[in-house]
Amino acid sequence: MDSDPPLVRDVFPDLIAELADLLMAEGERFLAISVLDVRLVGECGCADDFCRSIRTADHPPGQPYGPGHRMVPLLPQHGMLNLDVVNGRIMYIEILNRPR
C-alpha cells in the first residue's frame, strides 16, 4: 500500500498559516481553505539557492498546465509567494527569496 505524501502543513506549518492569511486577504477564500490540505509531492529541483518552491501535485516538469490554469500572486512581507492553480487545485507553491 502506497502512503500519501506528507501534508505541507505538517512540514511547514508557518508557511501554510501565512498562505491561508494572504489568500483570505486577496479574497481567495476557497484556496485559503484548500491550502490546509495540500501535500508535499516534491521540491522544485532547480538548485537555485533562492528557490524553496514545492510541488503539491504530480505534473510533468516543463509542461504547461493547460486550460484552467491561473497564477495567484501573493504579497508576503518577505520574498515572493505565488501559486499555480488548475481548476481550483493548488498544483505548485512558488517560494522565492525567502529565509530558510
Language model feature labels by segment:
Residues 1-69:
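N-terminal domain-onset segments
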Residues 66-100:
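Short, compact, well-ordered microdomains
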